[in-house]
Structures are given as C-alpha cells and as structure tokens.
C-alpha cells in the first residue's frame, strides 16, 4: 500500500506548499504492508495487542507527545487522550501542540524548531540529550 502525492499532501503535509510536500513525498513515502497498518490501528479495524503500550510503566524513559494543530492523521484530541492515559505515572511525560503545523512537523522545513523545543523540554527535566559528535 502506498500514498499518492496528492493523498500525502492532504493527510500529512496539508500546511505546506505543493513543492515542499512533493519533495517530502519523494523522499519519505515507501509502500507499507497492510498488516503493519492494521496492527497500528490505521486500517480502520481494532488494534492489535502488539500495538498496546504499558502506560503505567514508571521506569520508562521520558515521553514528549508532539502534535500539530492542523494534523489530519492524528488530531489533537487523540494526542490529549494518550497524554491522559500516561497522566498517572511518575515518569516524565508532557504534551506539546505546535500551532499551524501538520503531521509532517518533524520532517518538513520547520523540523529544527520542533527539535529545539524537544531538546529544551529534556533540559527542563534534567535530562541530557546525547547529540552526535561532528
């Protein structure tokens, strides 16, 4: 299963211009097996037990739930619902919604802003990011 450039733009890159959306489609879109999408709950059916996380695991690493305000694939309500599932844990957890951004927010031309926010969030919680050395 694969996405056409038009469908990619509508679902993933709806806040971008056609040129940037087409470049992202060319670079990142690859066919995916339908079973994978079904396991993730993206095929309209029930989620597979393989796609369920242990929200009560206090020993897990930090979790920053990032979303775009204009995301058509995972709406803000879905991200907030996931955050609420993790709300009772003592593990570091936080939500962040970026205004005027779509699902492509971590791969489009504004990705550095999102990355800087995530690094700052980690720093606020006393967590040092391990950045690659040049």
Across the structure, where does each feature detected by a protein language model lie?
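Helix-rich cap/lid subdomain of alpha/beta-hydrolase
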Residues: 1-31, 35-40
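Alpha-helical elements of Rossmann-like donor-binding domains used by nucleotide-donor carbohydrate transfer enzymes
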Residues: 7, 23, 81, 113, ...
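Short gly/ser/thr-rich secondary-structure transition/capping motifs
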Residues: 41-49
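The feature captures the conserved acid-bearing segment of alpha/beta-hydrolase catalytic domains
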Residues: 49-60
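Short beta-strand/loop motif that positions the catalytic acidic residue
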Residues: 59, 65-67, 71
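Conserved alpha/beta-hydrolase "acid-adjacent" motif
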Residues: 72-81
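Mid/C-terminal beta-alpha module of Rossmann-like enzyme folds, strongest
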Residues: 81-82, 88
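Catalytic active-site module of serine/aspartate enzymes centered on a nucleophile-bearing elbow/loop
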Residues: 89-134
């Amino acid at each position: 299963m694969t996405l056409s450039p038009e469908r990619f733009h509508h679902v993933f890159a709806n806040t971008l211009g056609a040129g940037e959306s087409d470049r992202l489609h060319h670079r990142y879109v690859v066919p995916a097996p339908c079973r994978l999408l079904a396991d993730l709950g993206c095929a309209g059916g029930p989620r597979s037990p393989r796609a369920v996380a242990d929200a009560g695991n206090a020993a897990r690493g930090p979790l920053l739930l990032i979303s775009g305000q204009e995301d058509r694939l995972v709406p803000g309500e879905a991200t907030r619902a996931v955050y609420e599932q993790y709300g009772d844990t003592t593990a570091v957890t936080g939500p962040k919604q970026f205004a005027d951004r779509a699902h492509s927010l971590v791969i489009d031309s504004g990705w550095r802003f999102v990355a800087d926010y995530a690094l700052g969030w980690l720093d606020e919680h006393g967590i040092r990011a391990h950045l690659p050395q040049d």
